[in-house]
């Protein structure tokens, strides 16, 4: 990790929905839900370099995605009114490891990581709550990545209660297909009236994913992967997919099952986390730079204890 006060490197983790209940539909078209969010230690990496050219650059350029439509760029633009110095700019390098369109929140995580980093590097001094409030404009999953704790979530996913969860190993599988979230949430057969549960019920008994049957119907490869993974335990879908996961008590068993995963699917073994790896790395950066006179007053008060 680079501890230069003008540079910062942060991991940008994936999340899992340990269950996902859809409890209603709002007048604006969004769905009310309940879910348990847990981070995993499978991460992208973002490198930030502070500039003084008032420009936001992101590399590498993603084909068929204009920079202005990139969630990282949009997150940075949200913070430009709060910059300590109007000349501040940022160069961002994204190193991808997380699969796109997998239901593990890669794009939301990247946007949240940008909010957290620029809040410090640009001296914005916004609270985590304010960052989450800004972030939800870009995506319902962004607040949990901003807040950085495993959570029981309600609303569209932005109402968060901190929880402590077991931290098992997970086998994560990505079938070779892309799930359209819009297609899933507009399907007339999607369950939208699951009765709400209490957080105590969620922590003790868990739940299911209301999207699973519809996702399998539209995506035969997800169904195939689900049936395969189900041979080894309680296979689950995260978000609207396409990623599936299975929890294990130990690393050896997770690796053993992964070794037999069909090669046509991507697979990873990862560990559950109750604190986002982004926050752990950011707090380490701040601790390292507390004593630097010309940077101390720029550090966000939400992180300086």
UniProtKB/Swiss-Prot annotation:
One of its GO terms (biological process) is isopentenyl diphosphate biosynthetic process, methylerythritol 4-phosphate pathway. Keywords: ATP-binding, Isoprene biosynthesis, Kinase, Nucleotide-binding, Transferase. It comes from Marinomonas sp. (strain MWYL1). Belongs to the GHMP kinase family. IspE subfamily. It catalyses: 4-CDP-2-C-methyl-D-erythritol + ATP = 4-CDP-2-C-methyl-D-erythritol 2-phosphate + ADP + H(+). ATP binds at residues 99-109. GO terms for molecular function: 4-(cytidine 5'-diphospho)-2-C-methyl-D-erythritol kinase activity; ATP binding. Pathway: Isoprenoid biosynthesis; isopentenyl diphosphate biosynthesis via DXP pathway; isopentenyl diphosphate from 1-deoxy-D-xylulose 5-phosphate: step 3/6. The active site is at 15, 141. Catalyzes the phosphorylation of the position 2 hydroxy group of 4-diphosphocytidyl-2C-methyl-D-erythritol. This is 4-diphosphocytidyl-2-C-methyl-D-erythritol kinase. Its EC number is 2.7.1.148. It comes from the Bacteria. InterPro entries: GHMP_kinase_C_dom (IPR013750), GHMP_kinase_C_sf (IPR036554), GHMP_kinase_N_dom (IPR006204), IspE (IPR004424), Ribosomal_Su5_D2-typ_SF (IPR020568), Ribsml_uS5_D2-typ_fold_subgr (IPR014721). Pfam families: GHMP_kinases_C, GHMP_kinases_N.
